[in-house]
Amino acid sequence: MNRSILLLTLFLFSCSPNDNSMQENSILHDEKLRTFYTYVPSNIDKEMTLVVGLHGYTGNAKTFIRKGDADFNNFLEINNFIGAYPEGKSFYANGRRFSSWNDLAGSIGQGPKGDICDIDRDHYPYPPDCVNPHRCSWASCGDDIGFVEKVIDYHKNQYDIKSVIVIGMSNGGMLAQAIGCKLTDKVDAIINIEGMQALGMSCIPKKPLTMVIYGAKNDTTVPPEDILAADGYFYEPMKNTVNEWKNAFNCSNSSKKQISNPAEISEEHFYNCDGGVTITSILDHNNDHDWPKPYKWGINLLFAPILN
């Protein structure tokens, strides 16, 4: 087969849907087949919203979507959104599967403030695609931003997409923020769930972009306030990232909101920013390293600053 035809075939290859709404797809990126899933709502219309969901460390598309009240596809169906679920590169070590995303921090291991981990940090297996990894490196070294860009382009070619929202949990949140910084021409908003980037490496887009960032006080895995995590890694405090974004985009107004039921939440919303974007920080006073709970309510909490 002609090589150009083969590459085109691999780029557009799509498996039969697992059910009436989910499709498994493959794209050739960096000479590797990368997998993503597409959720198609019941009523396809014009000017659709595409939501790209990014799983956390060791996760996959299914662990992001979840089931029951936490089922992300239910949220997409209600709002008539198309969903895309890319999967990070994975490998096996010590009998366990590891998957991760390259947010241009966890793969590097060292930033402007020095090493991103303590001397006695927990050890994570080095991804095989990393050559001579730094001692603090733990995430894939692949071009995940380019991969997600291809996933976005794929859906724009298939559907009438008006806006793109990228949402990620933990390591997926780190990548969501990195995508917001690198792909501002293709993304309209990001939602970072407990994905504080490495200390000194929290990026800011060159163009205004709407962001929602969520952290939980009892989260010791990727803490939103304390710099040092339980595993010995250093993370940029959430308030620093929020301040840098709202200052960069000249947000002139803000409002605060306290929620006590069903969860204790402190929310600060910055608006009247350049380009009409908004910046929202959500601090959960009781949660740990998890989505805001109860889950169905929590998904709406995260999207409300963008959709309302």
Indicate residue ranges for each PLM-predicted region.
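Serine-hydrolase catalytic machinery in alpha/beta-hydrolase-like enzymes
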Residues: 29-40, 48-165, 178, 182
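Primarily recognizes the serine-hydrolase "nucleophile elbow" in alpha/beta-hydrolase
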Residues: 153-209
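The conserved beta1-alpha1 loop
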Residues: 52-56, 194, 215-216, 285
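Active-site nucleophile loop of the alpha/beta-hydrolase fold
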Residues: 88, 191-199, 216-220
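Sec-dependent signal peptide recognition
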Residues: 1-8
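C-terminal motif of bacterial Sec signal peptides marking the signal peptidase cleavage site
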Residues: 13-14
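Conserved strand-to-loop "acid loop" that flanks and positions the catalytic carboxylate
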Residues: 213-219, 225-226, 231, 283-287
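C-terminal catalytic histidine-bearing segment of alpha/beta-hydrolase fold enzymes
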Residues: 210-214, 236, 244-308
